[in-house]
Amino acid sequence: MSTHFDIVIVGSGAGGASLAQRLAPTGKSILILERGEHLPREAENWSPRAVFIEHRYRTTDRWYDKNGHPFTPNSYYWVGGNTTFYGAALMRLRGRDFQEVQHAGGVSPAWPISLAALAPYYDEAERLWQVHGQRGEDPTENGDEPPYAYPAVSHDPAIAELKGHWQNAGWRPFSLPLGVKLDEAHPFTSTCIKCKTCGGYPCLLRAKCDARTLAVEPLLDVPNVTLLPGRKAVRLETDPSGKTITTVVCQTAQGEERWTGDIVVVAAGAANTAALLLASASPTHPSGLANSSDQVGRNYMFHTLTAVVSLSARRIDVTFPKTLAVNDFYFGDPRGGFDKPMGHIQLLEYMSGQTLEGQISDWLPPALVPGALAGAVAERLLSMLVISEDLPLAENRIHLGPDGRINLDYTHNNLEGHERLVNTLCASLNGFVAESHAISQHRLELHSLLPLYGTAHQLGTVRFGADPKSSVLDPWCKAHDLDNLYVVDTSFFVSAAAVNPTLTTVANAMRVGDHLIERMKG
């Protein structure tokens, strides 16, 4: 095999795989380097114990927080990346998310592109990723989005009751857009069966729309695309001028490998992409590759999250509860009294007894929790997630220790709107459940985060912008400092917004792909 390719992509997650898929029809030779292996298809894929208690598929890497405490990030290094384990919520950023927005805790900066630049790619990504939803329900929609190609996923009985409860309170709950291969009109032939093992699990049926099933696997037989798993990129080398990347150096079980490409794209995840650039410091890039702005690794975001766990006196009739969301408070409280953004509410996945044990394992070892008790509690739980925007701060950053380890310095910020929304949600559940408890990420140490979420929505670190002094990438996601380096994972985000970033990552990779196609024509 030749060691030179037209395009070398580091990472096979939503960004890297979507870019490869976009570029494959050009006939250009494409190499995808993935640190993980192919995920085994096995019974444990759907085992709550294996997934949440034994952490069978999660990385064993250790990162270190600002106090030097080690913790295991909620990351999965497999072909297809983290989307193999995500909850399949696929939402567009709102139009105002691309603009400068004043929050209670500071300013969320404007993006160098508008919603209009991504809109056609959002349309395409929603079709490709088979997003099920219903236009016209979400009060924050622009109103010009095309109808979803797939109908909204139906609500379980208890979720339908909750929807009515909120509507009676004047709220406007809507169907959460989900990427699943579901055909409810033909349940006996539908790939998706609306099971209890979706979010947090790999799908044994290949029914979840993720990078592995929709982007990577269709490329495996494409002759000009080569996927090499088990290759961790550890350094990028440049020519003597420092303007062009010449080599991607990988660490494998067999030793070091070196690959060259005319264009190099990094899509290793916000933390690992920043770490790779910092580890690639050289005489021409003494502070790290593409880091003349001193912004590589900075502005790390991962949303402010609170799980609201509600306990009912009666058994709650749910199998697939994650179908409902609320955006009434996204940009402020419609009741008045607070005109700053608060965030987004969505129902969470079904939580079995062993899932519950895994979620509390940082505080109470599973061996001390009787299985029957955990199961009985889980049958009466209804869980929701409040997502709010954290702001990009220079001091919230990824940096490397002397031994190359990843250090994550992070201080929670912009909490007022989030806490108001949590309190509003808990109050709204009065009369529907017996009691509600908020488990807030920002009240925990970084090494004791909710395991299901943790660092799952990592963003920023290599943000794009028009000014090389304050950004790492240009508006096409090419590094300001280099001629042939692009980044297409969530590193490029300027702000976090308050929704899952996957759909935006896919749409942007398509946009950058079209730009690269035009570049290669020249």
Residue ranges and their predicted role:
Residues 1-7, 25-26, 518-522:
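Extreme N-terminal leader/targeting segments of oxidoreductases
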Residues 7-32:
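N-terminal Rossmann-like FAD-binding beta1-loop-alpha1 element of flavoenzymes
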Residues 25, 29, 36-41, 46, ...:
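Glycine-rich loop(s) and the adjacent beta-strand/alpha-helix scaffold that form part
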Residues 51-139, 332, 387-389, 394:
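Redox-cofactor-proximal catalytic regions of oxidoreductases
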Residues 67-74, 92, 111-115, 293-412, ...:
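FAD cofactor-binding and catalytic pocket of flavoenzymes
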Residues 102-233, 449, 454:
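Conserved redox-cofactor binding core of oxidoreductases
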Residues 174-176, 194-195, 234-237, 380-388, ...:
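A glycine-rich dinucleotide-binding beta-alpha-beta segment and adjacent secondary-structure elements
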Residues 495-513:
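A conserved FAD-binding loop/helix module that cradles the flavin
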